[in-house]
């Protein structure tokens, strides 16, 4: 099965909600905040550079793994920093894990795949690192490779 891996440099960023404002004529319109648009453009650039322009087939089930590495604040003690790097402490701060996933998956719409509805398995983790980044892996999966829960479905 086909797999694409790429890295987005810098601290992870979550997808901000759309802003709705009133126009001078009394109507309303929504727009995506500039920070979100810039981050999604960075994701697209990183994908293009590292993917050899692979586009997964329409309807192809996909497994996506996202590992977000958060920066360690400079004022952190040596002991605490070591614990963070050894995964004895995890980032329990913003951005939320689901908003990071949303920014990655939405940015790849119509670029890596037709729509993120093709993602049938999503695995995500948050860690600390001296080199903040987001690592993404997209893998085409066959229906026979999908694992089902061990409990019975009703």
Please describe what each predicted stretch is:
Residues 1-122, 137-142:
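Histidine-centered catalytic/metal-coordination loop motif
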Residues 121-132:
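Beta-rich nucleic-acid/ligand-interaction surfaces
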Residues 144-150:
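Conserved small/polar residues in nucleotide/adenosyl-binding loops
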């Amino acid at each position: 099965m086909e797999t694409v891996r790429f890295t987005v440099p810098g601290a992870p960023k979550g997808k901000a909600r759309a802003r709705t404002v009133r126009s001078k004529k009394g109507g309303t319109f929504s727009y995506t905040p500039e920070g979100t648009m810039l981050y999604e453009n960075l994701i697209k650039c990183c994908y293009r550079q590292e993917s050899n322009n692979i586009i997964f087939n329409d309807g192809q089930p996909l497994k996506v793994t996202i590992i977000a590495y958060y920066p360690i604040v400079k004022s952190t003690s040596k002991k605490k920093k070591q614990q963070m790097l050894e995964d004895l402490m995890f980032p329990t701060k913003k951005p939320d894990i689901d908003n990071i996933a949303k920014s990655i998956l939405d940015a790849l719409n119509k670029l890596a795949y037709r729509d993120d509805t093709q993602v049938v398995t999503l695995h995500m983790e948050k860690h600390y690192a001296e080199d903040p980044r987001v690592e993404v892996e997209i893998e085409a999966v066959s229906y026979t490779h999908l694992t089902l829960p061990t409990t019975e479905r009703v």
